[in-house]
Amino acid sequence: MYRVTIVYNHPADPAAFDEHYSSKHVPLVQQIPSVKRFAAGKCDSLDGNPPSAYALAQLYFESKAEAGQAFASPEGQNAAADVANFASGGVTMLFTDEETVLP
């Protein structure tokens, strides 16, 4: 599987981020073609210190080529363009050809 991880830095207004993300951004992401799995959540820490990032999302595809086609599609472009509407802290995107080490 090919994984795209989007790391969202801490936004200026967390409540506005949460509202826009759940009501507007998630529906756009759900329209991206070829996504096999979409997982997201707010970051936490084991020691109680503030996490280094606010939230992250992971999109899984069969291959790197599928991921590229999905993000180049109109639906992928719409979702990417929407990020500027709520992610005031910025984002980092990570791309991984995932290998399962343990079942």
Swiss-Prot record:
Annotated EthD domain residues: 12-88
SUPFAM superfamilies: Dimeric alpha+beta barrel (SSF54909)
A molecular function (GO) term: oxidoreductase activity
Extent of the signal sequence: none
Highest taxon in the source lineage: Bacteria
A Pfam cross-reference name: EthD
Full protein name: Uncharacterized 11.0 kDa protein in thcB-thcC intergenic region
Species this chain originates from: Rhodococcus erythropolis (Arthrobacter picolinophilus)
